[in-house]
From Swiss-Prot:
Pathway: Amino-sugar metabolism; N-acetylneuraminate degradation; D-fructose 6-phosphate from N-acetylneuraminate: step 4/5. It comes from Lysinibacillus sphaericus. This is N-acetylglucosamine-6-phosphate deacetylase. Keywords: Carbohydrate metabolism, Hydrolase, Metal-binding. It catalyses: N-acetyl-D-glucosamine 6-phosphate + H2O = D-glucosamine 6-phosphate + acetate.
Length: 387
């Protein structure tokens, strides 16, 4: 079902700031036109929402691929294969994420992504690029190919920004590397989100990076200097510094439930951003897949390189939301913060992350068990599930 104008009746509208029950929501021309009780309108398609909840569409700030597609493929159809898969899990917007590779490969990916940002009618929207690698630590490389890891270089970043049409919104880097702190400051001043990740920084180096503008931690706990009582490391810095938002991959593989609970208690919902870090095997059968020229084995235990290193995930955003609720018993309002609102704030979006009149009509309808029933993008029902 595809609507140009839609009213959802008698639904509970949930935002980060609270909820309103038994509301009608009128979506028109891609925007939220009105939220009120008993909206009267003629010639408008209607959807009954009794007993269900309307949440802002999920925003995934860290996703490499799905359905055999990867951002680094630099193909014409790549993002247009990816978009229809992510929207099925309630993700209405995302950052296409890269990984460490040769500069030539990066050049192609930046150029191709910059040319393919207009979504088709059944796709999630690409908000921009998240550059993960090559400016990371070889000591914390994980699945990032060692041969292509280099020191942060602002001239290279400026070239990529130009090739992408100024679409780079976030960069993961290791600030302790040579030129790292200068890059943190320069990027932050230019409006790019600096996320500390794949980093062996000390706690003190972490604090310095935050003072220079770093505001996020890439997939907390994974491939970062761990906590020690004499050196809290990057993990300690992400957990303790309020100015840092923590990305979490809540798939029961990348971290223990207790580690998720600890992050929730220390950061609170205001300090957490749920991500998938998904790779091309998402939405595909178990088997062998490629990640940056490396063989990845995908099983029920996750995605791993031959050496055992985790290589992204096959997590979906709706499952991440359910997992977070299961572990922490957090409220729906808190889930909105962690799945959309915080990401929108980080990206300085003034049209997403909230269900408010004038905002984009991007939303999901879920039941009391957080099972997805509909995904709405630009006021149209793009996905209707059998839940």
């Amino acid at each position: 079902m595809f609507f140009l104008s839609l009213i959802i009746r008698n639904i509970t509208v949930v935002n980060a700031s609270g909820r309103d029950e038994q509301m009608d929501v009128w979506m028109k021309d891609g925007k939220i036109a009105q939220i009120a009780q008993h909206i009267h309108a003629q010639g408008v398609d209607q959807l009954e929402g009794s007993g269900k909840f309307l949440l802002p569409g999920f925003i995934d700030m860290h996703i490499h691929g799905s359905a055999q597609m990867d951002t680094m493929d630099a193909s014409d159809e790549g993002l247009h294969i990816h978009g229809p898969i992510t929207i099925k899990e309630g993700t209405t917007s995302f950052l296409a994420t890269t990984m460490t590779q040769s500069f030539d490969w990066f050049d192609r990916a930046q150029r191709q992504c910059g040319n393919n940002f207009s979504p088709k009618s059944d796709e999630a929207e690409v908000l921009g690029l998240h550059i993960e690698g090559p400016f990371v630590s070889k000591q914390r490389a994980g699945a990032q190919p060692l041969d292509y890891i280099v020191q942060p270089d602002m001239e290279v970043i400026k070239k990529w920004q130009a090739l992408s049409g100024q679409k780079i919104k976030q960069i993961t880097l290791a600030p302790e590397e040579p030129n790292g702190m200068a890059a943190v400051q320069s990027l932050s001043e230019s409006g790019v989100i600096v996320s500390i990740g794949h980093s062996d920084a000390t706690f003190e180096q972490m604090q310095e990076a935050v003072q220079l503008g770093a505001s996020q931690g890439t997939h907390l706990y994974n491939q970062m200097r761990p906590f020690h009582h004499r050196d809290p490391g990057v993990v300690g810095g992400v957990l303790l510094v309020d100015a840092i938002k923590a990305e979490l991959i809540v798939d029961f593989i990348h971290m223990h439930e207790g580690a998720v609970e600890m992050a929730y208690r220390l950061k609170g919902a205001d300090g957490i951003i749920l991500i998938t870090d998904a790779m091309r095997a998402k939405g595909m059968p178990y088997g062998e897949y490629d990640l940056g020229g490396q063989l990845v084995h995908v099983t029920e235990s996750g995605a791993h390189l031959s050496n055992g290193s985790l290589a992204g995930s096959i997590l979906t955003m709706d499952q991440a939301v359910r997992n977070m609720r299961q572990i922490t018993n957090c409220t729906l309002e808190e889930l909105v913060k962690m799945s959309s609102y915080n990401a929108a704030q980080q990206l300085k979006l003034t049209n997403k992350g909230q269900l408010t009149e004038g905002y984009d009509a991007d939303a999901v309808i879920v039941d009391e068990h957080l099972l997805l029933h509909q995904t709405i993008k630009a006021g149209r029902i793009r996905v209707q599930t059998n839940n």
